Amino acid sequence: MTKTTTCLYHFVVLNWYIFLNYYIPQIGKDEEKLKEFHDGGRSKYLTLLNLLLQAVFFGVACLDDVLKRVIGRKDIKFITYFRDLLFTTLAFPLSTFVFLVFWSLFHYDRSLVYPKGLDDFFPAWVNHAMHTSIFPFSLAETVLRPHNYPSKKLGLSLLGACNFAYIIRILWRYVQTGNWVYPVFASLSPLGIILFFSASYILSASLYLFGEKINHWKWGATVKPRMKKN
């Protein structure tokens, strides 16, 4: 695929995510039945955090595309480094995690993660925009251009830190309101919740390594860019 086509792809997907980040929080804003959905903002839902993350990543990717054409590759090392770090450690693992976990729980017992009553407010296309298309968009990014992966220690540490921060957010929300962000947690014992969180990190770490394998399979070994020291 040509560089122009890749730039166009980034621009189109960026605008798609900008639209979703604006449109979805507006759904049923004045509906009493969706009061719990809107209380606490988007930061309590991993799905909505992921949509915001994808918008940020594709925004950085677009900026990288434009600057490379305007001022040249050598002058924007930091932007390229940040783009790759964001995609490899967060954007790809998180979008794949949301896709796999949501649909696994949905087909097992949808009431654990997406109660049927939400269908009255969220059309099917919105559900798929939040939980399905995120994966092929990220997968396409892995095959459109190579990404320099950081060391496993750095990559998995950043991923782990973000996992831990979100767990704290979930627990803090529960302490404040007495309600779990996702119904699945209400069906688990304290030990079950600990095991769920542990399994979630193991899965997300595995997806990080999976993304690295895809990158190596498609592009071969890549040289990690070194940041210049002052």
UniProtKB/Swiss-Prot annotation:
Residues 1-7, 67-85, 142-155, 212-230 are cytoplasmic. Keywords: Cell membrane, Hydrolase, Lipid metabolism, Membrane, Transmembrane, Transmembrane helix. Signal peptide: none annotated. InterPro entries: ADTRP_AIG1. It is a multi-pass membrane protein. Its main location: membrane. One of its GO terms (cellular component) is caveola. The record marks 47, 131 as: Important for catalytic activity. It is found in: Cell membrane. Its EC number is 3.1.-.-. GO terms for biological process: cell migration involved in sprouting angiogenesis; cellular response to oxidised low-density lipoprotein particle stimulus; cellular response to steroid hormone stimulus; long-chain fatty acid catabolic process; negative regulation of blood coagulation; negative regulation of extracellular matrix constituent secretion; negative regulation of leukocyte cell-cell adhesion; negative regulation of leukocyte migration. The chain crosses the membrane at residues 8-28, 46-66, 86-106, 121-141, 156-173, 191-211. It is an enzyme of class 3 (hydrolase). GO terms for molecular function: hydrolase activity. Residues 29-45, 107-120, 174-190 are extracellular. Hydrolyzes bioactive fatty-acid esters of hydroxy-fatty acids (FAHFAs), but not other major classes of lipids. Shows a preference for FAHFAs with branching distal from the carboxylate head group of the lipids. Regulates the expression and the cell-associated anticoagulant activity of the inhibitor TFPI in endothelial cells (in vitro). PANTHER family: ANDROGEN-DEPENDENT TFPI-REGULATING PROTEIN, ANDROGEN-INDUCED PROTEIN 1-RELATED. This is Androgen-dependent TFPI-regulating protein. It comes from Rattus norvegicus. The gene is Adtrp.
